[in-house]
Design a protein with these regions (language model features):
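N-terminal signal-anchor module of multipass membrane proteins
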Residues: 2-51, 114-120
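Cytosolic juxtamembrane amphipathic/interface segments immediately preceding
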Residues: 7-19, 153-157, 238-245, 313-316
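Long, contiguous internal "core" modules enriched in hydrophobic/ aromatic residues
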Residues: 25, 84-93, 98-107, 208-210, ...
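Hydrophobic alpha-helical membrane-insertion segments
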Residues: 30-37, 165-182, 329-338
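Low-complexity, proline/glycine-enriched hydrophobic segments characteristic of transmembrane helices
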Residues: 42-120
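Membrane-interface segments at the starts/ends of alpha-helical transmembrane spans
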Residues: 14-19, 110-125, 198-210, 243, ...
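Alpha-helical transmembrane segments and their immediate interhelical/interface regions
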Residues: 120-152, 284-306
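Transmembrane-helix bundle segments that line or gate the permeation/cavity pathway
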Residues: 41-60, 129-238, 255
Length: 341
């Protein structure tokens, strides 16, 4: 540790996007934007069709049950002079009309018609952001736990997971944007208090204020730790010595503990609470397993890609075997937790 891990040539190695790769990336982004627009258009068209069909169903129900309305009108006219009798008959007519209209199967009447096209688009953005957050957090945990374990083999590929968790600030911006449309996604916000006994028992935890505060704390600490580990890692390579290593060791040890708590609560807040009526005692571990499996797969793909482009020549077959072992292990662990779930 008295000297730098890499040669000066390796320290100055920088990945540069070729024009071909840049065009592919821009092309994929363009295709993604087009698909989003097409999906929004189709969802909007589907909503309009649903509204039309709902109106037709309502008309058909009235046409198929004219007796109900006739009886209601006759009873109302016959009992016009007797208030109590008219009210009773009118109540029976309303009850019969509700049964004919199918309130129970209609999702509670006219107040709820399912997700709109706007909700679908926002949910797609929300889930996409979640996907990349889990990969970035898997990479951050990978660096921290290997620093705590003083593992030397990952030094050769450390810059790749560091680049992966560099996405966290952008993910935080996406998370902040998600706060603006929480009422379009989370059922525990959509359903008013007092209408669902089970959700009411969870409102001490599941409430917008607590959700936002926890999210800000989690992302703030994660980004701070990521930036500190990245900076200390760079200094360690350029300056050598043990000072920066020991600092990163202490930070990593504390972060591993914080990660276990914060990431479990994050999984409950951002994923599990989408279905507030569902119970799980291992969902945090299940999410962690999937996050690590995805991060290891992404890390392996990126390292192999960089080697094919002529970078990271110091990465050998032993490193590749370690990647494969990690990916296999966490995939099995994820599958085991899925079966247990």
């Amino acid at each position: 540790m008295a000297s730098s891990h890499f040669t000066p040539e390796q320290l100055t190695e920088r990945f540069e996007l070729s024009s071909r790769i840049r065009n592919i990336v821009y092309g994929l982004v363009g295709v993604g934007v087009i698909l989003v627009l097409i999906g929004a258009f189709l969802a909007q068209s589907g909503d309009g069709h649903h509204d039309d069909s709902h109106g037709e169903e309502h008309a058909e129900l009235i046409t198929e049950n004219p007796t109900i309305h006739t009886v209601a009108n006759d009873q109302h006219e016959d009992g016009h002079g007797e208030d109590s009798h008219a009210d009773e008959d009118h109540g029976h007519a309303d009850s019969a009309h509700s049964e004919a209209h199918g309130d129970d199967g209609h999702g509670g009447g006219h107040g709820h018609h399912g997700p709109t096209w706007v909700t679908r688009v926002l949910t797609g953005f929300y889930m996409s952001n979640l996907y990349f957050i889990t990969i970035a957090m898997g990479a951050l945990f990978f660096i921290a736990v290997h620093r705590v374990g003083n593992a030397g083999w990952q030094t050769a590929i450390r810059r790749v997971p560091e680049a992966m968790f560099g996405w966290l600030p952008f993910a935080a911006v996406g998370a902040l944007a998600s706060f603006l449309f929480m009422d379009q996604i989370f059922e525990w916000i959509i359903i008013p208090e007092g209408q669902d006994a089970l959700i009411d028992t969870k409102r001490a935890y599941l409430n917008p204020t607590g959700f936002i505060i926890r999210s800000i704390i989690f992302f703030g600490v994660w980004i701070l730790v990521a930036r500190m580990l990245r900076r200390l890692s760079t200094r360690e390579d350029t300056l050598g010595g043990l000072q920066n290593f020991e600092k990163s060791l202490g930070i990593s040890a504390g972060f591993v503990v914080f990660f276990a708590i914060s990431y479990s609560l994050f999984a409950i807040d951002w994923i599990k609470s989408l279905e507030p009526h569902w119970f799980s005692t291992i969902f945090g571990v299940y999410t962690f397993a999937g996050s690590m499996a995805s991060a290891m797969a992404t890390l392996t793909i990126l390292v192999y890609f960089l080697r094919r482009q002529g970078y990271m020549k110091y990465v050998n077959d032993s490193h590749a075997q370690d990647f494969n072992t990690y990916m296999l292990g966490f995939s099995i662990f994820w599958a085991y937790m899925w079966v247990s779930q």
